[in-house]
């Protein structure tokens, strides 16, 4: 199931050239992912309070068009894989005024016990409802 996160570009996200700085695209993806998590599973703060974190293993993407200050955009994302504790996402960032695809990327993460930064191998057993919901959300 694809999911959308919408907002406008903020001034501090742009660089001297007047476009969103490349480092901020990962922040936009994180904002979208945190909203997705809260809307579909559990808020990240509740997850952390239960002793679980979600480190990023990899992220990559292509910059296809520019976003500028105050441009409205949406991040269209989907969970493309979930293997027990490891998960992968695909993203598209689209300027909603022009409908231009501005960025296309992927990221990989995993559930870990807070402080360990190692895969939470008993995640399925310890969080069966969350595991079940996560499995149902996968859209390859």
Which functions belong to the PLM regions below?
Residues 1-5, 68-69, 80-140:
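HotDog/MaoC-like acyl-thioester-processing domains
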Residues 8-10, 15-16, 43, 50, ...:
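Glycine-rich, flexible loop/turn motifs
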Residues 6-10, 62, 110:
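Generic structural detector for well-ordered beta-strands
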Residues 20, 54-56, 102:
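A broad, structural micro-motif
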Residues 35, 62, 129-133:
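Solvent-exposed, charged/polar functional surfaces in cytosolic regulatory/catalytic domains
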Residues 1-36:
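Catalytic strand-loop segment that frames the active site of acyl-thioester-processing enzymes
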Residues 36-87:
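Hydrophobic beta-strand-centered segment that forms part of the acyl-chain substrate-binding groove
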